[in-house]
Amino acid sequence: MVRGKNLFVLCCAMMGVWTAVSAAASVQFVDRAKALGIDMVNTSGATQEYIVEGMMGGAAFFDYDADGDVDLYITNGSSFAGFAAGQHPQNRLYRNDGDFFVDVTERAVVGDTSWSMGSAAADYDNDGQVDLYVTNFGRNTLYRNRGDGRFADATAVAGVGHRGWGTGVTFGDYDRDGDVDLYVANYVDFSL
């Protein structure tokens, strides 16, 4: 009897999986970014002639202003062709106001215009404020959250300004000592 009961449970479970797969096929996504205040054009190299032009950036979701709403930081690319003065693409920080996102990039002082690849957020200095690390094609940047809606460049002070080609980044307590550790993935070393 146990064998038959297990077979029945297995059959029911499989039917549930098939139902879930069928339901998932009908899911549709709708672009609501502009309606929610996120108005950004992500730039990548136009010619795709160089390897870096084929790479795009990322995003970090974190509560930078400690209001309980998850905010959004989006990295941007660049181009070797160059840009007119004041037209260079930059990374953006959008504050979540509950129903709408507000671009606070300039006030927060995180409008990095480097060729950014990735970002991650964590409280690296244990001051209760979530900080931000951005990887770039060039110098990476650590932004220390000042707690007043603005960030300060803490790259040199923290000694984490690698000038290679940083692509990915994450924070975690690797050695379990209670302090947040930083792990940066680099791509190509052009000096070889």
Predicted feature descriptions by range:
Residues 9-20:
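Bacterial N-terminal signal peptides
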Residues 1-11:
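Bacterial N-terminal signal peptides that target proteins for export
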Residues 20-192:
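Acidic, glycine/proline-rich Ca2+-coordinating loop motifs
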